[in-house]
Amino acid sequence: MKVSLFATCLVDTLTPSVGMATGRLLQRLGQDVVVPPTQACCGQMHVNTGYRREALGIVANHVRAFAGSEAIVAPSGSCVASIHHQQAAVARRAGDEALAQAAEELAGRTYELSQFLVDVLGVTDVGAYYPHRVTYHPTCHSLRLLEVGDRPLQLLRAVRGLELVELPGAEQCCGFGGTFAVKNADTSTAMLTDKMANVLSTHAEVCTAGDASCLMHIGGGLSRLRAGTRTVHLAEILASTEDAVTPDQRTTPAVRA
């Protein structure tokens, strides 16, 4: 299957290793991975902060960038949720019904990584090896809007060497929420404190999730505590094998229009 990788803004700029891990994983599973070069933001941040009119051009660019893609996969429940629940609404609110319909059609072919692996490829054992004690945080958008359910847990349970421990209060928000963490810093910090306490109670070496944004928030807090628990994206765990991968051995998915 020809799979278009939607890297997302945050992954592209701050955690590119997550995008590369996603590409390697999909290629290992026999997919023809391409990275459309004109892709940009999905527009979520603009919509969530009230800039719906400004988001219209972003939605149009996204639809153009991925037009003709057989399937679109992103290592982010948050961005995929925006594509599913916001993009068509932005176009329709602006009176562009043609764009709204194109956005809806594209959303039907857009998947969060665990959804694509389990629902489309029918795979739970991706051949990964990760000998660490791990706990999983279900991010809000993946849990509530996309309803990915236990798909990430199914994938993690099949990873050889991985010890999966349940996270208490897993369904509770980590407190990031994009600009929420900036506009409501005290509340965000209190929520993060609760999340970190729950993570540390598991004695896990690694806290994983399907969104780099939440992992950045949780990981920043844990690093300040010098707790010894680190954050690793789900894609990076699933891409891991017995063969150590050093930066110079990593291959970036082919970029084709």
Residue ranges and their predicted role:
Residues 1-257:
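Iron-sulfur cluster-binding electron-transfer modules in prokaryotic oxidoreductases
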